[in-house]
Swiss-Prot record:
Lineage: Bacteria, Bacillati, Bacillota, Bacilli, Lactobacillales
Pathway(s) annotated for this protein in UniProt: Fermentation; pyruvate fermentation to lactate; (S)-lactate from pyruvate: step 1/1
Location within or outside the cell: Cytoplasm
The protein's name: L-lactate dehydrogenase 2
Entry-linked Gene3D superfamilies: Lactate dehydrogenase/glycoside hydrolase, family 4, C-terminal, NAD(P)-binding Rossmann-like Domain
GO molecular function: L-lactate dehydrogenase activity
Domain of life: Bacteria
Length: 309
């Protein structure tokens, strides 16, 4: 990314892709934003809608395009994918979305793209790992949203439980984006004070908070059909950190190289993000039990990936 032009390509203009585009145009100075989707009419409508947003914010060339448009992009964001069907196994979902991913990643790489991939398609940790495998890119140039959304939900749950502002909560969810995620209770701070000095952190408290975090997505889906605003902002923050060379500490699906005793897989962890992508993984302190749980899921994840690939 030595050039001055700032260009992002979004693949997938569904609810997440569209919401992300809106957040990106609001919050990042771009020269060019390209939307790639099979349903071109919808993408063209989004372009027209986003042009009006750009008139209030930043001068941006927004248009629909093809995978070939990625050749000079800084970032390709992949939000495309299919949701899990009733009764469908996790492996079946992985197989379906891996095929979709392959149909995207190969032509993007063939275009000459030399930037960073950012992934939000689910299951995000596995599909981020698969993107790196399919692309052959260095691990630091492939990043997923990981447990960033889980972390946001944790902050909201704690803020509501303790009657404080979300900005007063410093907390993280690690590992898998999903039911195997790990709430790092020992490291939570409320107004710069350890959580255990603010309230009683017993098994009941932990269970209530974990349920609030893991159950929120299902609640939203049952009420409005899908979740998309939170992950859209997560994507925006990652892209902004890359475009602005922020060296920002974010929770992402990061390539692990020995951290937490795990190698060659992507899982949720704090990391430093800058113009080169993932600059550094910050290994959070975990108890022996939490570390074992994370390693157990990593082993399952590797098995599923090897079967699917």
């Amino acid at each position: 990314m030595d050039k001055k032009q700032r260009k992002v390509v979004i693949v997938g203009d569904g609810s997440v892709g569209s919401s992300f585009a809106f957040s990106l145009v609001q919050n990042c100075a771009l020269d060019e934003l390209v939307i790639v989707d099979l349903v071109k009419t919808h993408a063209e409508g989004d372009v027209k809608d986003l042009e009006d947003v750009a008139a209030f914010t930043n001068a941006t060339n927004i248009h629909t395009g093809e995978y070939a448009d990625a050749r000079d992009a800084d970032i390709v964001v992949i939000t495309a994918g299919v949701p899990r069907k009733p009764g469908e196994s996790r492996l079946d979902l992985i197989n379906r979305n891996t095929k979709i991913l392959e149909s995207i990643v190969k032509p993007v790489v063939a275009s000459g793209f030399n930037g960073c991939f950012v992934i939000s398609s689910n299951p995000v940790d596995i599909l981020t790992s698969m993107t790196q495998r399919l692309s052959g890119f260095p691990r630091h140039r492939v990043i997923g949203t990981g447990t960033s959304l889980d972390t946001a939900r944790l902050r909201v749950a704690l803020a509501q439980k303790l009657n404080v502002a979300t900005t007063a909560v410093d907390a993280a969810v690690l590992g898998e984006h999903g039911d195997s995620s790990i709430v790092n209770f020992d490291e939570i701070m409320i107004n710069a004070q350890p959580l255990k000095t603010v309230t009683t952190v017993d098994d009941q408290f932990k269970a209530e908070i974990e349920q609030a975090v893991r159950g929120k997505g299902g609640q939203i889906i049952s009420q409005k059909g899908a979740t998309f605003y939170g992950v859209a902002v997560s994507l925006m923050q990652i892209c902004r950190a890359i475009l602005n060379d922020e060296n920002a500490e974010l929770i992402v699906s990061a390539a692990l190289s020995g951290q937490y005793g795990i190698n060659d897989l992507y899982l949720g962890s704090p990391a430093i993000i800058n113009r080169n992508g993932l600059q550094k993984v910050i290994e959070a302190e975990l108890s022996d039990d939490e570390r074992a749980r994370m390693q157990h899921f990593a082993a399952k994840m590797l098995t599923m990936m090897n079967v699917a690939s």
